[in-house]
Amino acid sequence: MYAENDTIVAIATPPGKGGVGVVRVSGPKARAIAHEVLGYDPKPRHAHYSPFFNEEGDTLDSGIALLFIAPNSFTGEDVVEFQGHGGPVVLDILVKRIVSLGARLARPGEFSERAFMNDKLDLVQAEAIADLIEATSEQAAHSAMRSLQGQFSKEIENLIESLIQLRIYVEAAIDFPEEEIDFLSDGKVLNDLDTLLSQTQSVFASAKQGALMREGMTVVIAGRPNAGKSSLLNALAGRESAIVTEIEGTTRDVLREHIHIDGMPLHIVDTAGLRDSDDVVEKIGIERAWKEIDQADRILFLVDATQTNEVSPERIWPEFYARIEHHDHITVVRNKIDLSEEAQGIDLSLSHPVIRLSAKAGNGIDVLREHLKACVGFESHAEGGFMARRRHLEALTVAEKHIQLAKQQLLSANAGELVAEDLRVAQNALSEITGAFTSDDLLGRIFSSFCIGK
């Protein structure tokens, strides 16, 4: 275990060579370390160009030093940043010098963790820092910045405040039992519960869009050999990612592509043709293909339109259909319509969606892209969204469930104690999102996924 009031140091810029490298120090010894490295006490919040000295007074490097005094810093502690040349060796030398002066190497995410512990930002904002760094599209970067600025946190805090006010009202009825029936049957509690449900569902819908922006969806292209799976992968990716030949079994392993559809990450997996094979390498690829299919958000069941007019996967390939656990994840894709002379488009009236396209000619690819967005409810034109994570959705789901339970308790039993308890559980679930009510284990998992120096 580390002391909570010790001083930490880390390189804050990415590994490798660059024009500038930043070493960040935070903790009670930051000012003393700055004095030893610079040879003088820097003025807070001013940029000082200076040599960086070792213990013998020799120059290690030169650059800019910035000192921030607690609580007016990112971490809420004394912080000093040394901005020198971006070579890994010279940065390591500077870090060793700072460690010799009483600092220790920071854990991944420890600077952000200290900012959270010192109330400089909440847990959603801390996560947004990592999401901003990892953003893979402009839309994702904008959404992460809105979360960092507190937009998502404000939505959650408003829900929590409404829950608190309703709990106060209900618990007042419990404290004055002779008034309880009047309190709980006057319509206010029911109306407030309905309002809370509506607000929670609205925040969940926005958070779901943010989670899709961050995590995207995984789509597996599956089917018999030579149905055109690799051609479809290339068409969706917009480049030649997979080898396409007329020879069955060309794809022997799982191929992956990562693209964006209007800002939503799409993880495309092209599987080996599913068939019985004596080839050892191909058999391994087929087993991997089944694992990917089991984990997919959507399965594109590719059919060669020149071989059959059937659209039911259960009839086309009964063995494949029987092995699939989530039949509602299947979309039938009739490929090669340029040869079968079918019209491109989508049919949603059947047991499974059916899309007719030509991967080789590119006809119907836009229809497929729009269908994939619709499958997960992604709204590409939604404005002002914020970034969210799976754990946020889970917490909102728990909160909504217990608000629903509170409503049921009110209507069925008029039981104030049970209503108040469900409201308390809902409040705690929402408080986990911002970190106001969070286990140390969860904090450890979140911050350990951050970069060192953040």
Curated annotation (Swiss-Prot):
Superkingdom to which the source organism belongs: Bacteria
Protein location: Cytoplasm
Keywords: Cytoplasm, GTP-binding, Hydrolase, Magnesium, Metal-binding, Nucleotide-binding, Potassium, tRNA processing
GO molecular function: GTP binding; GTPase activity; metal ion binding
Binding site for GTP: 226-231, 245-251, 270-273
Amino acids binding Mg(2+): S230, T251
UniProt cofactor(s): K(+)
Binding locations of (6S)-5-formyl-5,6,7,8-tetrahydrofolate: R24, E81, K120, K454
Positions of K(+) binding: N226, T245, I247, T250
Gene Ontology terms: cellular component: cytosol
Chain ranges of the TrmE-type G domain: 216-377
A Pfam match: MMR_HSR1
GO biological process terms on file: tRNA methylation; tRNA wobble uridine modification
Coiled coil found in the keyword field: no
Enzyme class: hydrolase
Cofactor note: Binds 1 potassium ion per subunit.
EC number(s) from the headed UniProt entry: 3.6.-.-
SUPFAM superfamilies, A to Z: P-loop containing nucleoside triphosphate hydrolases (SSF52540), TrmE connector domain (SSF116878)
InterPro entries xref list: G_TrmE, GTP-bd, GTP-bd_TrmE_N, GTPase_MnmE, MnmE_dom2, MnmE_helical, P-loop_NTPase, Small_GTP-bd
HAMAP family associated with the record: GTPase_MnmE (MF_00379)
Function: Exhibits a very high intrinsic GTPase hydrolysis rate. Involved in the addition of a carboxymethylaminomethyl (cmnm) group at the wobble position (U34) of certain tRNAs, forming tRNA-cmnm(5)s(2)U34.
Record's subunit section: Homodimer. Heterotetramer of two MnmE and two MnmG subunits.
Family statement: Belongs to the TRAFAC class TrmE-Era-EngA-EngB-Septin-like GTPase superfamily. TrmE GTPase family.
Name assigned to this protein: tRNA modification GTPase MnmE
Organism: Hahella chejuensis (strain KCTC 2396)
Gene: mnmE
